[in-house]
Amino acid sequence: MFVVTNRITVKKGYAKQMAPNFTKGGPIESLKGFEGIEVWQIDKDDYSEDMYVNSWWETEEDFKNWVNSDVFKQAHKNTGKSEDSPVIKSEIVKSNVLSSLNRR
């Protein structure tokens, strides 16, 4: 299992508003190796909060295929930085799951 976390710092109050954009489904659900997406909210300070957008993939190769796909390009076509954007910064963290215990 391969997990990619996009750690997005946003202006306070925007995480709940933005989160559904990542989990509304669509073509990503039919991609080989896609397992799911969750968005977590982490309070930072009085001015910002973090959203951890976690996507699960069977393999790193499946994730790379997503990033290089037309589906990815379409999903990210309007994500350019603008003056009024609530996004302060973002960072991608890639992880291999070594051990887990699940009860969902």
UniProtKB/Swiss-Prot annotation:
Subcellular location: Cytoplasm
Keyword Iron: yes
Amino-acid positions noted as binding Fe cation in the UniProt annotation, renumbered to this chain: 6
UniProt site (Transition state stabilizer): 66
One GO molecular-function entry: heme binding
Keyword Transmembrane helix part of the UniProt annotation: no
Record-linked PROSITE patterns: ABM
Major subcellular site: cytoplasm
One Pfam family this sequence matches: ABM
Gene Ontology CC entries for this record: cytoplasm
Binding positions for heme per the UniProt entry: 76
Alphabetical GO biological process terms: heme catabolic process; iron import into cell
Reactions that this protein is recorded to catalyse: heme b + 5 AH2 + 4 O2 + 2 H(+) = delta-staphylobilin + Fe(2+) + formaldehyde + 5 A + 4 H2O; heme b + 5 AH2 + 4 O2 + 2 H(+) = beta-staphylobilin + Fe(2+) + formaldehyde + 5 A + 4 H2O
Keyword entries, A-Z: Cytoplasm, Heme, Iron, Metal-binding, Monooxygenase, Oxidoreductase
Enzyme class: oxidoreductase
InterPro entries in the record: ABM_dom, Dimeric_a/b-barrel, Heme-degrading_MO, IsdG
EC number annotated for this UniProt entry: 1.14.99.48
Function: Allows bacterial pathogens to use the host heme as an iron source. Catalyzes the oxidative degradation of the heme macrocyclic porphyrin ring to the oxo-bilirubin chromophore staphylobilin (a mixture of the linear tetrapyrroles 5-oxo-delta-bilirubin and 15-oxo-beta-bilirubin) in the presence of a suitable electron donor such as ascorbate or NADPH--cytochrome P450 reductase, with subsequent release of free iron.
HAMAP family: Heme_degrading_monooxygenase
Family matches, as NCBIfam families: PRK13315.1
Quaternary structure (record): Homodimer.
Record-stated family: Belongs to the antibiotic biosynthesis monooxygenase family. Heme-degrading monooxygenase IsdG subfamily.
Name assigned to this protein: Heme oxygenase (staphylobilin-producing)
